[in-house]
Amino acid sequence: MVKKVVSDLELKDKKVLVRADFNVPMKDGNITNDNRIVEALPTIKYIIEQGGKVILFSHLGKVKTEEDKANLSLQPVANRLSELLDKEVQFVAETRGEKLESAINALQPGDVLLFENTRFEDVDGKKESKNDAELGKYWASLGDVFVNDAFGTAHREHASNVGVATHLDTAAGFLMEKEIKFIGGVVENPERPFVAILGGAKVSDKIGVIENLLEVADKVLIGGGMAYTFLKAQGKEIGHSLLEEDKIDLAKDLMERGKDKLVLPIDAKVTKEFSNDGEIEAVAIDHIPADLQSLDIGPKTVELFGKELEGAKTVVWNGPMGVFEMSNFAKGTVGVCKAIAELKGATTIIGGGDSAAAAMDLGFADKFTHISTGGGASLEYLEGKELPGIKSISDK
């Protein structure tokens, strides 16, 4: 199914509604990482060049109370966007009403307007998050065409993506197009050998992803806290490392299904306390003492994973290999990140979330083919699910 892209739309003199993903991390009213804003620029600039009137909207955080509203305004995003575009971005501190409508009606071709956090509509009854039909229809009435560029919420059925799309000719923005191409391509038609690396704390978060990737990938390497549930299922002693007791049978079943594909750690970095300062040693995976816990994969596992990656043509990485926020337990994540970044001739994709943060912190971001902007959306896409935000984009 080929979806419409923004370049398929007639934009001149049109009011172009753009659902962006400006759900950026904030501290004390300041944006701490503007990557999602930067990723939206190609679509916005294209509409400006084509003589469209840009009407941007997005959610930011979870809004349940009036106090949340005070802390989660999109005003700082408008300011940052204005700097990045080097032009005025008009901010309207409302999600509906006369002030917003007259500001939109006064727009000239090439103008840019951002209105307030869509989740302000959740305070009195979750209208945005429950895809309230009236709200979707109202927002749609503000524009002539709709561009959905918010991959980060593509797995949600909200008024601001699916609701609006019900009423208008809808196209993917360039970021959404890129996500469909890379993440969708991995699931549907990867170049082989295809190696997936999964980390993070819990098996329960990634059951669907593991199941689907065992079908489509040639190898699935498992690190992070979730590896210990698999190791326990093999009968190994894991000390007091993270364990999901109720997922041991599932882990056995997955290992049975993926016996030639699943690769688990062979050594671990262990310590007594959940702290960066204790005594640390690297031990073989079947020698974790009862009073210790593993907080990272060991050097031999980094080497093993590096060997498994050799010659890969497609690599997807989702989730850190250890507690990478603590410097002494970041080496596994750093090692894997380096190994992927140094591959020649491979399509390398990071599936958002903590792995993306790790790659950026380490300065490897530009070494990857694609870093997804969607954590949950990437995971659900990798599960092989049809995402409502993508489904609702018009077909070509």
Curated annotation (Swiss-Prot):
Gene3D superfamilies: Phosphoglycerate kinase, N-terminal domain (3.40.50.1260). InterPro entries: Phosphoglycerate_kinase, Phosphoglycerate_kinase_CS, Phosphoglycerate_kinase_N, Phosphoglycerate_kinase_sf. It is found in: Cytoplasm. Substrate binds at residues 21-23, 36, 59-62, 119, 156. Its main location: cytoplasm. Belongs to the phosphoglycerate kinase family. This is Phosphoglycerate kinase. The gene is pgk.
